[in-house]
Amino acid sequence: MSYEQQTSVESSVTLPELLRKMTELGGSDLHLSTNSAPQVRVHGHLAPLPGFANMSPSDTKRLAYSVLTDAQKHRFEENLELDFSFGLKGMSRFRANIFNQKGAVGAVFRAIPYEIKTFEALGLPTVVSDMCKKPRGLVLVTGPTGSGKSTTLASMIDKINIDRHDHILTIEDPIEFLHNHKNCIVNQREVAADTHSFGAALRTALRQDPDIVLVGEMRDLETIEMALRIAETGHLTFATLHTNSAYSTINRIIDVFPAEQQAQVRTQLSLVLEGIMCQSLLPKSSGDGRCMALEILIPNAAIRNLIREDKIHQIYSMMQTGQDKFGMQTFNQALATLYHKRQITLEVAMQRSSNADELRELIDRGSGLNESYGGGGGGGGRPATRPTQPASGGSPYAQGRPIGERPPVR
């Protein structure tokens, strides 16, 4: 087929058709790029949609522009990139990023279910539910891109919306999960649509009488400083960061500030921090989805002192021994638990661990295991590198990039 014939085939395709194909395949992301067929991410792996030819620059631009308002088109052409979200009735909501590459338009669309998953469906432990009951303080959900942070936060906000009678204010870029008023009033503000920036929204947030504030992402010094201040003034504040461990999250927050302010910030953080959840998605041993490994830090008096005294490196040992009493667990303890519950293979556990020797010792001893921690799926019994009866059922987390060979898209 000639290039002209290929592009003429593509010109009849609509974006809703491609998104429907993606959702039918159980995909999480749709990628549009010139000189490539549309590609979807299924169980964390990219593969071309079967039956579609390579797209031309005019194809990708037409598809991307088909869901933009005039204001969004203007903003994209001015800034050369755009984050936004939208919904397709009867299908799903989608978060999108449109960008320029080599002079042509590219786009990525991520599926966001209308349904918000429950704690039980996500396999979140009881200690996470306790964080939602806090009257004030800072709760952080961290992890790499595509680790399901938005899914976890949406579940936590929904639980608060059901259990409490408060005002929830969210500041997001863009709005992902939609929250209806239940027992709480929920106001969701989108950067560039409802406010100019995270900083601008946070500066006026306290005038809007919130009880709970969600900051979509703490990207810079101003946002971090404002989030700490809001938590300090008696509001329960949720936020995300792209960090890979609990103690690196603390360091990231402190290191953003100038050296002369860091002692003050350590004291401030030691007082307001109520929890850090650092999560990662792993391929399930059954091959039909992913499960979540979750590191949890709950600041007790000793940990608050370590933060204040700049002894962050000692926090890890406190987490290792704080599981039974405080509900904490390290990432290695989470991996060992998932392995013993036959949800992941030994190979995956070792590949994802930053300290394989410690993990091997945990697995061999059978210690440090959290029986209340589900990781987003079922399973149980004695461990096996290749379980004969693996846990079944796909993960409710739609994102992630697991290790393994790329499966074909059927």
Which residues fall in each region the model found?
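Short, flexible helix-loop junctions that flank or precede catalytic/ligand sites
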Residues: M1-R410
